């Protein structure tokens, strides 16, 4: 499973982090697949490559709590939510409308048949 998480690269008492996409089984400061951005907690500066972060989130990467908060502050999680989940609800309403139309079309009116009987 791929995770978006922080990798510490700062020196002692001067933390600095990289936001990376990495395998969940790798150590905190181990190898990573791709560099997404940086975070400096001392002055609160966040730099994120939105295209890469969005790509990884769409492919199913799970952000850690801290990374999710950083992405939310930058507005990326809201964009992802709107595209991923709102699109599903509009699809389901369109599908529901299409099935209702099919149901109306398949119902044929019953006609009475009369037979002429000669006496």
Curated annotation (Swiss-Prot):
Keywords: Ribonucleoprotein, Ribosomal protein. The lineage of its organism: Bacteria, Bacillati, Mycoplasmatota, Mollicutes, Entomoplasmatales. Residues 89-103 have a biased composition (Basic and acidic residues). Residues 89-119 are annotated as: Disordered. One of its GO terms (cellular component) is small ribosomal subunit. Pfam families: Ribosomal_S16. GO terms for molecular function: structural constituent of ribosome. This is Small ribosomal subunit protein bS16. The gene is rpsP. PROSITE patterns: RIBOSOMAL_S16. Belongs to the bacterial ribosomal protein bS16 family. It comes from Spiroplasma kunkelii.
